[in-house]
């Protein structure tokens, strides 16, 4: 019921843009490898607590935030990966990785930040929608283990749909692409 909202999602996002940029840069400067995202989880939990959003820890370092709407309804999950890669960051940034040999080369710091922004806004407008939104801050995406832990800990129980996202440089900024079924749902390891 977007007509019940006092501000559009874009207006709400613009209001918290500086806060989200700061959060993303903090995550970027302190990356952690799969299944070692302990400080990352602490930062996520601190932000969820600041925003008054209920959560629970699952797996080793995953967190599920839960936002319940006005009435019962469908349950939708948004998934953001939180782990970094074992790559040295050679960029000269004010918020460059402080963890030698580890960086957010795949944009998981941005994914986590976007999910956190969505969580904040959805929590503020929860009286305008029915159902439940779960935000999965998923550990160990790069090792293909994190989603299994969320499922094993019951995170998917009652979920009607899951939306994950990834930055993609051929899609214009401010736009998104979606389609039916799985998109980009494959993984493999190549040894050279």
Q: Would you name each region that the model predicts?
A:
Residues 93-103, 110, 127-192:
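Histidine/acidic-residue-rich, glycine-tolerant segments that coordinate divalent metal ions
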